[in-house]
Amino acid sequence: MAEIEQSMIDEMKDGFPLFDNKGDGKIDGAQLGDVLRSFGLNPSNAEVEKIAKANEGKRLSFDDYLAIHKQVLGQGEVGSYEDFFEGLKLFDKEGTGLISGAELRHVLATLGEKLTEAQVDELMAGGGGQEDAEGNVNYDTFAKYLMLG
C-alpha cells in the first residue's frame, strides 16, 4: 500500500470534517470521489464509480477513508507510450505521423476521461502539443510528452 507523508495525513485530517454533513466524524461513501479529488488524487470516473459502489450506503471514518486514499494512490493508472501512440495513430488517416490539432483537442475533450477546455489548452501549450503551420500535431512527440507526466 502507498505511503503518505505525515504532514499530508494531518492536512487531510484537518479537511475531512468539511465533508461530514451529519456531524458524526464520518462521510458518505457517495462523497468519496469529491474527497479524493480535494486531497490531490485524480481517480478516473470509472475508479470513483467502483469505489462509491463498494461503499454505497456506508458512513466512513477518517481511518476508513485513509485506507481508500492509500489504495487509490497506489494504483494510479498511467498508460504506456505504446497505448497513447496507438490510440492517437487511429486518427492519422493519411499515415503521415500527424493528426489535426483540432481533432486532437476534440478527442481530449470528448473521449475517455474527458478533459476541460482549460486542461486541453494546458496540454496543447506544453512541448508535445505544438501545432505546425498547417495546424497538425506530431502524435509521436505528443505521446512522448504525455509520458513525461
From Swiss-Prot:
Disulfide bonds: none annotated. GO terms for molecular function: calcium ion binding. Residues 7-42, 79-114 form the EF-hand domain. One of its GO terms (cellular component) is myosin II complex. It comes from the Eukaryota. The keyword Repeat applies. InterPro entries: CALM/Myosin/TropC-like (IPR050230), EF-hand-dom_pair (IPR011992), EF_hand_dom (IPR002048). Keywords: Motor protein, Myosin, Repeat. Transmembrane segments: none annotated. Myosin is a hexamer of 2 heavy chains and 4 light chains (two regulatory light chains and two essential light chains). PANTHER family: MYOSIN LIGHT CHAIN 1, 3 (PTHR23048), MYOSIN LIGHT CHAIN 3 (PTHR23048:SF2). This is Myosin, essential light chain.
